[in-house]
């Protein structure tokens, strides 16, 4: 991949992420930009490009499961840990200053430990679960992405019948919500 093509892909990913940000901030503004209605499509674009980039990096730079796992963990936790900390701090402060600004769903501080642990383990969205990270609605996408990393690793680094057995077990573990969107990541 050339440097200019890599920059081009980064620009598309950044643009898609920005559209998602606009979509999530729509409730804050009376007049929405037309482009903000394409948040769902932007998520799909982001997932497709992520799958492409991960496949490329795995093919050219990461020489085994260990390299792949270390790279993916570093990438995902460099986003997840700050997101968890910042969300908890902002929500706690915001709720303390003006609790009426927070819908009932975001006030579940009695489940704070469960929300944080499931967010660190990326188990928020398994099967019918939707354990939201306080007010951080977009955090679901990290959960999906992690399980796509796992599935990709299995299909890339495990051979023979064991590959399909482990892949099947992971699909059964994560459930249909995550599994049904998985092909988008591999387009």
Model-predicted regions and their roles:
Residues 12-22, 42, 48, 82-90, ...:
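Lipid-exposed faces of alpha-helical membrane segments in multi-pass integral membrane proteins
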Residues 55, 77-146, 150:
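Membrane-interface helix-loop-helix regions
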Residues 1-6, 67:
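Short, Lys/Arg-rich N-terminal segment immediately upstream of the first membrane anchor
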Residues 28-32, 60, 92-103, 160-161:
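Transmembrane helix-loop junctions in multipass membrane proteins, especially transporters and channels
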Residues 4-59, 74-83, 179-180, 184:
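Functionally critical transmembrane alpha-helices in membrane proteins and complexes, commonly lining
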Residues 10, 68, 141-143:
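Short alpha-helical catalytic segment bearing the HExxH-like zincin motif
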Residues 40-62, 141-160, 164-187:
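Specific transmembrane alpha-helix
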């Amino acid at each position: 991949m050339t440097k200019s093509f890599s920059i081009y892909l980064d620009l598309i990913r950044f643009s898609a992420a920005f559209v998602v940000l606009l979509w999530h901030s729509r409730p804050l503004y009376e007049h929405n930009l037309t482009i903000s209605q394409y948040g769902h499509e932007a998520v799909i674009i982001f997932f497709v490009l992520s799958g492409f980039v991960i496949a490329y990096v795995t093919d050219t730079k990461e020489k085994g499961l260990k390299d792949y796992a270390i790279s993916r963990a570093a990438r995902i936790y460099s986003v997840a840990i700050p997101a968890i900390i910042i969300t908890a701090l902002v929500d706690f402060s915001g709720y303390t200053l003006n609790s009426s600004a927070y819908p009932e769903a975001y006030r579940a501080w009695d489940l704070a430990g469960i929300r944080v642990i499931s967010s660190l383990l990326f188990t928020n969205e398994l099967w019918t679960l939707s354990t939201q990270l306080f007010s951080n609605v977009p955090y679901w996408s990290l959960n999906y992405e992690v399980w796509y990393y796992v599935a990709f690793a299995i299909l890339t680094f495990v051979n023979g019948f064991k590959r399909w057995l482990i892949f099947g077990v992971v699909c059964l573990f994560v459930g249909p919500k995550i599994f049904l969107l998985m092909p988008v990541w591999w387009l």
